[in-house]
Amino acid sequence: MNIVVQHRIADPEKFFSMDAQEVGAGGPPGVQGRQFFPSTDRSVAVCLWEADSIGTLRDYLDHVTAGASENAYFEVDADRAMGLPQAAAA
């Protein structure tokens, strides 16, 4: 399942001290970060993930970003999406 996460960043210093590639690769089995798009003003970021469920991703990511951001999750409609990476589109 493809999931987009919107991060409302409360603590930019803490949030951006984390390595996005490490966070993306450090989840439980079946959870993989694919893309990371931070805003230039560091107030928000959007990420694309692959995971078995929103709950599995939420359990991991809310813990990792605790105190740094508030996260909103939604499943991507892959049939209508544009530009999904090949691995995410499969």
Predicted feature locations:
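Short S/T/G/P-rich N-terminal loop/turn motif that feeds into the first structured element of a domain
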Residues: M1-S69, Y73-A90
